[in-house]
């Protein structure tokens, strides 16, 4: 069982990407399980993903990076024992610190694949302007293996370039992918990256 | 909300959520296109009210509407023109379930609750709907003082 995180700040397009990736990976023959963590006690995202025909394990009531890491551990053990998927896609809350989740998963001896962090190009100025948000989002970006510049269909080339430079300064080692899930840009690149690490195992 | 489920991570400071689930109904049937209009107006109303209360950023406002044959979901990041509504309208109904989740940066948890409830009540009233009381929940996400931390 391999695990991939699709992380990123609130509203960056995680759920839409999880649906798109899951469709593609399932079509290629991988058994995919989806684990969604939401801030609210009443899940919305999990219900939406289920509406696309996927089975979702919903962890609500707090953030798995810090508040309810124990729930993540139990849920992953359950998934491994009961469903034995090839791949678990985790969509943490928009406030989650991907590195903390990685630590929890590594402690379980589960193979962890790339951490994909979405960065919303339509809000890049705002997100990197307010001190608290900047600290959170910079931490998320630092933990990324791939940074997906999301919603590029809604902004100009200049804005994309500016966002790309901003995230590169924070995490120069990460691969940067231009993503428009709605238009399909970048989805195949990410699916291939995920598929390669999953098949390696 | 259990106290030990509150986040103490300073990176989460200033972000609060409020979730509500309710049954909405009226005598006159509600067609699918009106459900879509309801969802859109709810998104605009909640985000506008949160900004009015002083929100700096709309983390997200998300909702779904569930009827016997339909399932619509809506979200916004606060720009009035940027409301997404997807899903199936289904048959006309006299009642439906609404789940609404607001995650807001820059106002207190009580203000998130008040703004969301105020906008929800206004939208419900505008569509002539009545709401069956379901206990709302405030989700506090940051508590600066210490305590158990299971991460």
Residue positions per predicted region:
Chain A
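Canonical P-loop GTPase G-domain recognition
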Residues: 138, 142-201
């Amino acid at each position: 069982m391999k695990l991939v995180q699709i992380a990123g700040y609130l509203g960056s397009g995680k759920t839409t990407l999880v649906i798109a990736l899951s469709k593609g990976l399932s079509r290629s023959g991988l058994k995919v399980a989806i684990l969604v963590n939401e801030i609210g006690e009443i899940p919305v995202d999990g219900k939406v993903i289920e509406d696309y025909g996927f089975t979702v394990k919903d962890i609500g009531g707090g953030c798995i990076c810090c508040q309810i890491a124990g729930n993540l551990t139990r849920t992953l053990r359950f998934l491994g024992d009961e469903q034995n998927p090839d791949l678990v896609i985790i969509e943490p809350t928009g406030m989650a610190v991907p590195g903390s989740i990685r630590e929890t998963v590594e402690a379980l001896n589960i193979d962890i694949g790339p951490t994909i962090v979405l960065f919303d190009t339509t809000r890049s100025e705002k997100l990197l302007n307010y001190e608290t948000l900047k600290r959170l989002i910079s931490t998320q970006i630092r933990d990324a293996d791939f940074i997906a510049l999301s919603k590029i269909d809604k902004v100009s080339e200049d804005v994309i370039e500016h966002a790309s430079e901003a995230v590169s300064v924070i995490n120069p080692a990460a691969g940067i992918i231009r993503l428009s899930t709605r238009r399909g840009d970048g989805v195949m690149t990410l699916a291939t990256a995920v598929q390669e690490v999953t098949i390696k195992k | 909300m259990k106290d030990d489920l509150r986040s103490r991570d300073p990176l989460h400071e200033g972000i609060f959520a409020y979730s509500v689930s309710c049954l909405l109904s009226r005598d006159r049937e509600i067609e699918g296109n009106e459900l879509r209009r309801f969802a859109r107006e709810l998104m605009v109303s909640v985000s506008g009210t949160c900004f009015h209360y002083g929100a700096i950023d709309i983390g997200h406002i998300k909702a779904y509407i569930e009827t016997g044959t339909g399932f619509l979901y809506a979200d916004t990041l606060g720009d009035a023109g940027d409301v997404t509504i997807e899903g199936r309208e289904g048959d006309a109904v006299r009642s439906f379930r609404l789940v609404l989740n607001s995650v807001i940066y820059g106002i207190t948890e009580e203000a998130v609750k008040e703004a969301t409830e105020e906008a929800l009540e206004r939208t419900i009233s505008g569509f002539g709907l009545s709401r069956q009381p379901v206990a709302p929940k405030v989700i506090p996400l940051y508590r600066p003082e210490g305590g158990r931390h299971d991460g």
